[in-house]
Design a protein with these regions (language model features):
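Surface-exposed coil/turn segments at beta-strand junctions on protein surfaces, enriched
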Residues: 44, 96, 125-127, 138
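Hydrophobic residues embedded in beta-strands of well-ordered beta-sheets
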Residues: 101, 111, 141-145
Length: 228
């Protein structure tokens, strides 16, 4: 979809498409094969995954709540089960709200929990840089999703303890996590021409003994140069 089409979408339609990416596309892909394990090695099972994200904004438009960006994280190669969605510059649950950030916990295609920071400003600085870390972990028989170390000119610091959701789980490891699933389902959902870069910069894998490995391969989901 090109930038012109995205910029012409209504906010309601953009929200529908964002929700559609987590309720339709992954399920359509889930037949493709067995779960691909995440760095499961002799050191021990993976019980925590951290994804470092970077966003470079071009020229935002606060009047149209654009751009809107979403990242997704799940314990396996399917969204049939529990997973988390992180919305930036517009919360979609339970109804659309302008600006800010929102972490959502889903079960299949049903929303279960949400949490947000207290700053609901819309993105309004040109060339703004946003950084944050998405965390998924197993703690005390619970699957925990969290946003930490967030920074933004528009929103200030976020992910300082206020953005954490948890749910009981039968899982005792996260070996089924696959970064390709994250990148396939995370995207700039509205006004992509207002985003210069959206990149998953690195991934850290932890066992009960601590840090197992770090994947420093940058995964560029979106890149746009208005001069080209």
């Amino acid at each position: 979809m090109n930038a012109q089409n995205l910029s012409g979408l209504s906010r309601r339609e953009a929200c529908r498409r964002l929700l559609g990416l987590v309720s339709v596309t992954p399920l359509a892909m889930s037949w493709q094969g067995a779960i691909q394990p995440a760095f499961a090695d002799a050191i021990g099972n993976t019980i925590r995954v951290e994804e470092d994200w970077y966003v470079k904004i071009g020229t935002p438009d606060p009047d149209s709540d654009s751009p809107q960006i979403t990242s997704v994280i799940a314990p396996g190669w399917t969204l049939s089960g529990k997973y988390a969605v992180f919305d930036m510059n517009g919360a979609t649950q339970p109804d659309f709200s302008s600006g800010g950030v929102q972490l959502q916990l889903w079960s299949n295609d049903s929303i279960r929990q949400t949490c947000s920071n207290t700053n609901w400003a819309s993105l309004h600085f040109a060339n703004e840089e946003i950084r944050y870390t998405s965390v998924m972990s197993i703690q005390d028989d619970e699957l925990v999703f969290e946003i930490i170390n967030g920074s933004s000119e528009s929103w200030g610091a976020f992910g300082t303890g206020e953005m954490k959701l948890r749910v009981p789980t039968w899982r005792n490891h996260l070996n089924g996590y696959d970064p390709s699933f994250t990148t396939d389902n995370s995207r700039v959902g509205f006004a992509s021409h207002r985003v210069r870069n959206f990149t998953l910069e690195r991934i850290r894998y932890y066992s009960a003994d601590g840090l197992k490995s770090t994947d420093n391969t940058p995964r560029v989901l979106h890149q746009y140069d208005p001069q080209m």
